[in-house]
Every structure is written in structure tokens, then in C-alpha cells.
Amino acid sequence: MIRKIIYVTGTRADYGLMREVLKRLHQSEDIDLSICVTGMHLDALYGNTVNEIKADQFSICGIIPVDLANAQHSSMAKAIGHELLGFTEVFESETPDVVLLLGDRGEMLAAAIAAIHLNIPVVHLHGGERSGTVDEMVRHAISKLSHYHFVATEASKQRLIRMGEKEETIFQVGAPGLDEIMQYKTSTRDVFNQRYGFDPDKKICLLIYHPVVQEVDSIKIQFQSVIQAALATNLQIICLEPNSDTGGHLIREVIQEYIDHPDVRIIKHLHRPEFIDCLANSDVMLGNSSSGIIEAASFNLNVVNVGSRQNLRERSDNVIDVDVTYDAILTGLREALNKPKIKYSNCYGDGKTSERCYQLLKTIPLHSQILNKCNAY
């Protein structure tokens, strides 16, 4: 019997991480996959990345626009409310067998709430992880609203068990974002330098810095410290614009001050293959993106992880954690650039997550008893 699955996506990040899983499901005769699109995908400020989903020829079963222009804290809460209404309508119309979610963003929480009230089983990827920010609370809330958990690490599995999730509903599959990394043939350094107009004699830094909503009052000072430290280290910088969380507009204001700097390339959005190319060809990664924690080790790329956003996440040996001060960031960058290039073991998996997810999604029990969820103790 064919299973109908809806994946919810709200950002370039979650879609990029899940792309190989979605492709594997799309190729299957056992799965009828469609995608419900919301959030940053539908905003020109973030690259109208819904067009990537269309280009990949996935079926889109719903589009739920939200207002991301308002930079207030309340805008995130209001967006979740709008998305809850939208997901309810889409799920009620489409009647999927499973709603598939990833991570810790508000749109995933809204989708989980809608699904459980419509008696639709929820499968959650990347549950059980810690970060130490508001994202962690949302992630754990989604886990408690989910019926199955596809986790990246053993520690995440054990954390979910301690949270009261039943062990038989938890499967360690690895991080889905690693699959495409293992398959993609990256550009040579010469081609990469030509693409971005870089001096081949200078080193390259991939910079991604997202806002932490509890620290929005200091976010401009934080980002100035980050980019100034990178420039003081004589690095050429590929700077990706931040996400839509509260405070992102303040980071973009600072980024615009460097738009004419000869060593800075400001990028609104990178397609997934281009982003993988950046990971492969950079000499150091700087900022607070989860890609530095999860994906960079697969490229043996040293990472200077700044501040609290990924504070409690598991990390491989390539990550150097520093405070959000100019001196600490400068010291971290020098350490990262002076470390020998070695092969790191990535604690988040082996790049075979897509097949594991497919095998599970076509076989996990979906009987009505699975919906009657209660704590294991």
C-alpha cells in the first residue's frame, strides 16, 4: 500500500538538509511525497527559494505565506499562528498518512500541532539535540508532539528516552544533511577562486551568523566583532545573510556596511551544491550556524563557533568554541588557521541517512494505537 507523506519546509536550510531524503522518497513506488512550503521560501528577501523546490520537480501540496517583514519578537509568534491555520487546512484536504518534520523552527511546531489534532502520525528528524537557546525548547516540544523520532546520534536517542519517549519509536539514522556531501563532486580551488574573484594567495572564510532572539539588543555589536576579527586575520570572506528570526534585519544592516569591501562577498542565498562547494573550499568557517557543528567535519574544515546559539550541541573535534568578543574570536581564528589539516570523524553520521529514512517510512506501523501516545514512565 502506498503511503502518502507530506514534508513541511520553511527555510533554505531545512530543505537543503532534507533534499537527499526527499529525492529518495520521490523515487520510490511505495511513497507518495508532497511538500508544504511556508516561511522564508516565499520571501524575495531570502531568495524566493520555493523556486528551488519547483526546479527539483517535487509536488507542492500547499503554500502558506507569512509576514516576515516585521522584525518584532511578536512576529515569530504570529507567524506560528498563521501557519497553524494553514497547515490545518492543507492536512485536512490532503489527508496524509505521515507528516515529516525536521529540527526546531516555529513552522515545524505549528505543523506538529495541526497534525496531532487531525490524528496524523508525525515523524521528527534531529530530535533530542541540545542548543541552550529558545530553539531547544521548540525542538523538545516538537519531539513530545511526534510519534516517531529519526535521530542523528546515540546521545540524542538516550535524551529522548529520558524525556519519556518509548525506545521502540526512536531510530538512529544520522544527519540527513551529510548524504549530499558524500555524493557531490566539488569544484577545484582555482575554479572556486575565479567564481568569487578571490586572490589565490589568501585564505577564505565562510561566515554565517544568525540572531539569537534573547540577545537581540547586542546583536549588531556581536556581528561587528565577528566580521572585524575575520578581516583582521587577512581573510577573504563569503558572508551569507542571516535567517528571518528576530534580529536578522540588524545583522543585515551591518553586513551592508561591507558591501564594497574588496575582501567581502555578500550572498543572499546559496543553492545547496554551491554551499557544499563553499564548505569544501574554505580554510575556516566562522559564526554560529548548525552547519559548522554538523556538516563541516565531513570536509575536515575547522570551525570557530561563536557565542551561545549552538552552546550545548554535540560537536566533532574540528570545532573551536569562543565567546562573542573581538579578542576571543581573533584568538579562535588564529588557532583554527594554524591547526594542521587532518581527517575528522563526524559524530553525526556516515552519509547514508536517506536510505535508512526510506526503509523506515515505508514500514513503521501507522495503526491507530500509535496516536494514543503517553510517556514511557
Curated annotation (Swiss-Prot):
SUPFAM superfamilies: UDP-Glycosyltransferase/glycogen phosphorylase. Pfam families: Epimerase_2. Keywords: Hydrolase, Virulence. InterPro entries: UDP-GlcNAc_Epase, UDP_GlcNAc_Epimerase_2_dom, WecB-like. Gene3D superfamilies: Glycogen Phosphorylase B (3.40.50.2000). Its EC number is 3.2.1.184. One of its GO terms (molecular function) is UDP-N,N'-diacetylbacillosamine 2-epimerase activity. It catalyses: UDP-N,N'-diacetylbacillosamine + H2O = 2,4-diacetamido-2,4,6-trideoxy-alpha-D-mannopyranose + UDP + H(+). One of its GO terms (biological process) is UDP-N-acetylglucosamine metabolic process. Involved in biosynthesis of legionaminic acid (5,7-diamino-3,5,7,9-tetradeoxy-D-glycero-D-galacto-non-2-ulosonic acid)(Leg), a sialic acid-like derivative that is incorporated into virulence-associated cell surface glycoconjugates such as lipopolysaccharide (LPS) which could be a key determinant in the ability of L.pneumophila to inhibit the fusion of phagosomes with lysosomes. LPS contains a majority alpha2,4-linked homomer of legionaminic acid. Catalyzes the conversion of UDP-N,N'-diacetylbacillosamine (Bac2Ac4Ac) into 2,4-diacetamido-2,4,6-trideoxymannose and UDP. Belongs to the UDP-N-acetylglucosamine 2-epimerase family. This is UDP-N,N'-diacetylbacillosamine 2-epimerase (hydrolyzing). It comes from Legionella pneumophila subsp. pneumophila (strain Philadelphia 1 / ATCC 33152 / DSM 7513). The lineage of its organism: Bacteria, Pseudomonadati, Pseudomonadota, Gammaproteobacteria, Legionellales.
